């Protein structure tokens, strides 16, 4: 759910 690139491991 977060903007792309917020986390390299998980994007929710």
From Swiss-Prot:
Q: Which GO terms describe its biological process?
A: regulation of blood pressure; vasodilation
**Which residues does the record list as 4-hydroxyproline (modified residue)?**
4
Keyword list (alphabetical) reads: Bradykinin receptor impairing toxin, G-protein coupled receptor impairing toxin, Hydroxylation, Hypotensive agent, Secreted, Toxin, Vasoactive, Vasodilator
Tissue pattern of expression reads: Expressed by the venom gland.
Q: Where in the cell is it found?
A: Secreted
Instruction: Supply one GO molecular-function term.
Output: toxin activity
Q: Name one GO cellular component term.
A: extracellular region
Q: What is its main location?
A: secreted
Per the entry, what this protein does is: Bradykinins are a potent but short-lived agent of arteriolar dilation and increased capillary permeability. May target bradykinin receptors (BDKRB). May cause hypotension.
Q: What protein family does this chain belong to?
A: Belongs to the bradykinin-related peptide family.
What is the protein's given name? Vespakinin-M
